[in-house]
Amino acid sequence: MIKEAIKIQGTKEGLVIVLEEDVDIETLKEKIVNRIEKSLKFFEGATLTVRVKSLSVKEEKLQELKDVIFEKYGIEVRIKNFQEKHIKNVTDDEIFNGLEEGITKFHKGTVRSGQVVKYHGNLVIIGDVNPGGLVQAAGNIVVMGTLRGIAHAGFTGNKEAVIVASSLRAMQLRIANVISRAPDKDDASDYPEIAVVKKGKIIVKPLYHLNDLW
């Protein structure tokens, strides 16, 4: 039995599939194909990097895996670190370490009360986030509408993540493990604002003050 044989992570280099130690490549091939079949839109246009944590996996088998994925789905696959003795894991520090980095998901429509939209990358909401709605991203969050619910950016621990909204009236803001209370009613603004972590606290500034934050 393979325990967590496949881990899919979003990083600066795109989607990364991590293959665990002592794996059966045929079983992995089947599992990867099944994962892609279940989430075709998620993988559409993506670049896949396969990181191998075991040198027991033969290179020709990995090439076969690349060929199968490319022939079936047109997805380019890169094999990384195959010849290295010590394979470096993808860590949270590698994931979305800046405002301009990382893969992005676009969610079209209103996020309603009780609804959760979560993504291991940057997340753009084209619509509003209603009270009781929750949006979570490993990277940055941009709401092209009114943010009235809860937004949690950098949920993997990235304090460099930001939250941006056309109108920021959130019930709660979270960046990594830092939490901010809802703004007072009189403080709510109708112009775009950005929330960042500074000195261990979340601060909110007008978006046109962006250059003052760095």
Swiss-Prot record:
Q: What does this protein do?
A: Cell division inhibitor that blocks the formation of polar Z ring septums. Rapidly oscillates between the poles of the cell to destabilize FtsZ filaments that have formed before they mature into polar Z rings. Prevents FtsZ polymerization.
Entry's InterPro entries?
Answer: CAP/MinC_C, MinC, MinC_C_sf, MinC_N, Septum_form_inhib_MinC_C
NCBIfam families referenced in this protein's UniProt entry, alphabetically: minC
Query: Keywords on this record?
Result: Cell cycle, Cell division, Septation
Annotated protein name in UniProt? Probable septum site-determining protein MinC
Please give the HAMAP family that the UniProt record associates with this protein.
MinC
Which species does this protein come from? Thermoanaerobacter pseudethanolicus (strain ATCC 33223 / 39E)
The family assignment reads: Belongs to the MinC family.
